[in-house]
A protein has these predicted regions:
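AAA+ P-loop ATPase mechanoenzymes
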Residues: 27-31, 36-223
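Eukaryotic beta-rich interaction modules
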Residues: 6, 21-24
């Protein structure tokens, strides 16, 4: 990470970015941090977490805000209206990660390939909560600045053609998972080379309860 750090006010994410691990900030602030669209940033409230950065919506420019969804807010231990610090992340390719259901009473079975396909391009830290999906959005975001991302996403058309979740049970894309372990033990990005292991039983999370319904969920219902 660089030494440059900025402080921004947390506001809710829009539906297009919900549960995809994406944060939006002013492009001028991105330049200050030395990051481009698709790079990783550390967001820290009472806990540090990591997200992929995109530029702010035009109406948000100059407002000093960061748009993150309920999962990222939980991961950063920050609420809407809180101030968080934001800095450039030093992110490595994940060699191996272990995930487990984050909600008690849930058991999940699935194969490594299907799980990995649902997390491609995602940046995570140990203890983060994640949701499967959002792969195409992440690839589009990262490819615009960085070119083809085959080393991360592989043949994404094949993945998306089959939805990538063939080895998982129905409704799994709505399940929240906790990242129980990462190798190396630092901020990482999940790629097609990452080994993803599933602990089928829910793990105890010592921090606050995982949100079952977030502001973005409610916003989505209102839009329907």
């Amino acid at each position: 990470m660089t030494d440059k750090e900025i402080h921004l006010k947390v506001v809710e994410a829009q539906q297009d970015d919900a549960y995809k691990g994406i944060a939006r900030i002013d492009s001028e602030l991105m330049r200050e941090l030395g990051v481009r669209r698709g790079d990783a940033i550390i967001i820290k409230g009472n806990r540090p977490t990591i997200a992929i950065v995109d530029r702010a919506y035009p109406a948000d420019v100059g407002e000093g805000i960061i748009r993150i969804d309920g999962i990222l807010r939980r991961n950063a231990k920050a609420g809407i209206g809180d101030s968080v610090s934001v800095s450039k992340a030093d992110v490595k390719e994940a060699k191996k990660i272990t995930i487990a259901p984050a909600q008690k009473g849930i058991m999940v079975q699935g194969d490594e390939r299907s799980l990995r396909n649902g997390l491609l391009g995602r940046t995570v830290m140990k203890g983060d909560i994640v949701v499967l999906g959002g792969v195409q959005r992440r690839k589009d975001l990262m490819s615009e600045e960085m070119g083809e991302m085959d080393d991360i996403f592989g043949n994404i058309n094949d993945i998306l053609g089959g939805m990538g979740f063939g080895g998982l049970g129905g409704g799994v894309t709505q399940i929240k998972f906790v990242v129980a372990n990462v190798n190396p033990n630092q901020p990482v990005r999940i790629t097609e080379n990452t080994q993803v292991t599933l602990n089928p039983k829910a793990v105890e999370i010592s921090e606050e309860k995982v949100p079952e319904i977030t502001y973005e969920d409610i916003g989505g219902l209102e839009e329907e």
